[in-house]
C-alpha cells in the first residue's frame, strides 16, 4: 500500500503573493498530518518563490512524520540540507522561468557530479532520492550513483488521455519494477490528483506518492485535514 507525502509549497505560494506572514505552511503541515499524511514535502527553490528557509527549519522541529526536502543540486542547497538534516532529500532540476518542475533530473549526463553530491549527503545520514523520468537509463544511473530512492515523474501520465495515458502508465509500471529489482525504493509524483492517483498507487512496489496542488485545491472547499484524509483513503484502497 502506497503512503502519502503531502507537498505544502502552494500554501507558501499564497503567503508569498502578498509577502506577508499568512498562511503559514508550518501550521498547515500540522493539519496535513492530522489528515493522515505520512510525510511532508517542501521545495526550497533557489529563488525562494514560495518556501523560505525559516519554514524548513521550523518544519524539522515541529512535524511528527518525516520531512522530504526537494532541492536543486547546488552548493548552497548542500550546505543548507546538511545543517537541516531532513529525513530525505529529493534532487530535482530547476529553472527560474518555470512555473513548476517541468521534467526529471538528468542523472545519466551528470553522474560524476551527482555521485560526489549524493555521497556528501549520505555522509550526514540523509537518504537521497532523484526525481527522474521513467526511463531505464536514468534508473540505471541512479542505482549506480548510490541513490536510495527515486521518484518517478508522473507529469506526462497526468496530462495525457485515453490510450496515450495507458501507454505512459505501462512505462511507469515497468520502470517501477525495474528500479525495485535494482534495489531502489520507488516513489512517484507530479500532477497527481483525485482522478488519476489511484492507478499509480495500485502499482506493486510503489512506496509513496507525493501530491500537493490537487490536495491544496480541494482544501479550499473542505479544509486541508479532510482533503488529505480523502486522498489517503483513495490511495489506500489497493
UniProtKB/Swiss-Prot annotation:
Entry GO terms, CC: cytosol
Residues binding 1-deoxy-D-xylulose 5-phosphate: 9-10, 45, 50, 100
Molecular function in Gene Ontology: pyridoxine 5'-phosphate synthase activity
Gene3D superfamilies from the UniProt entry: Aldolase class I
EC number: 2.6.99.2
InterPro entries hit by this protein: Aldolase_TIM, PyrdxlP_synth_PdxJ, Pyridoxine-5'_phos_synth
Pathway: Cofactor biosynthesis; pyridoxine 5'-phosphate biosynthesis; pyridoxine 5'-phosphate from D-erythrose 4-phosphate: step 5/5
Marked site (Transition state stabilizer) residue numbers: 151
Location within or outside the cell: Cytoplasm
Statement: the UniProt record of this protein carries the keyword Transport: no
Residues noted as binding 3-amino-2-oxopropyl phosphate in the record, renumbered to the chain: 7, 18, 191, 212-213
Catalytic activity, reaction form: 3-amino-2-oxopropyl phosphate + 1-deoxy-D-xylulose 5-phosphate = pyridoxine 5'-phosphate + phosphate + 2 H2O + H(+)
Domain of life: Bacteria
Subunit structure: Homooctamer; tetramer of dimers.
Record-linked HAMAP family: PdxJ
Function in brief: Catalyzes the complicated ring closure reaction between the two acyclic compounds 1-deoxy-D-xylulose-5-phosphate (DXP) and 3-amino-2-oxopropyl phosphate (1-amino-acetone-3-phosphate or AAP) to form pyridoxine 5'-phosphate (PNP) and inorganic phosphate.
Name this polypeptide is given: Pyridoxine 5'-phosphate synthase
Species per Swiss-Prot/TrEMBL record: Prochlorococcus marinus (strain MIT 9515)
Amino acid at each position: 500500500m502506497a503512503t502519502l507525502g503531502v507537498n505544502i509549497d502552494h500554501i507558501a505560494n499564497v503567503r508569498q503573493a502578498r509577502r506577508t506572514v499568512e498562511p503559514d505552511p508550518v501550521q498547515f503541515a500540522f493539519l496535513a498530518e492530522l489528515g493522515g499524511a505520512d510525510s511532508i514535502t517542501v521545495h526550497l527553490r533557489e529563488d525562494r518563490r514560495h518556501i523560505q528557509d525559516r519554514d524548513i527549519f521550523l518544519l524539522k522541529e515541529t512535524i511528527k512524520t518525516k520531512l522530504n526536502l526537494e532541492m536543486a543540486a547546488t552548493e548552497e542547497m548542500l550546505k543548507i540540507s546538511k545543517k537541516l538534516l531532513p529525513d530525505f532529500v529529493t534532487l530535482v532540476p530547476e529553472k527560474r522561468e518555470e512555473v513548476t518542475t517541468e521534467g526529471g533530473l538528468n542523472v545519466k549526463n551528470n553522474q560524476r557530479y551527482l555521485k560526489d553530491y549524493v555521497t556528501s549527503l549520505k555522509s550526514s545520514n540523509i537518504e537521497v532520492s532523484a526525481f527522474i523520468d521513467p526511463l531505464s537509463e536514468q534508473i540505471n544511473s541512479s542505482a549506480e550513483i548510490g541513490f536510495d530512492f527515486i521518484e518517478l515523474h508522473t507529469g506526462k501520465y497526468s496530462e495525457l488521455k485515453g490510450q496515450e495515458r495507458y501507454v505512459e502508465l505501462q512505462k511507469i509500471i515497468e520502470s517501477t519494477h525495474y528500479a525495485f529489482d535494482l534495489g531502489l525504493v520507488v516513489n512517484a509524483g507530479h500532477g497527481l490528483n483525485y482522478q488519476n492517483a489511484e492507478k499509480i498507487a495500485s502499482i506493486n512496489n510503489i512506496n509513496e506518492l507525493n501530491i500537493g496542488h490537487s490536495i491544496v485545491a480541494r482544501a479550499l472547499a473542505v479544509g486541508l485535514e479532510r482533503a488529505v484524509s480523502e486522498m489517503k483513503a483513495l490511495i489506500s484502497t489497493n
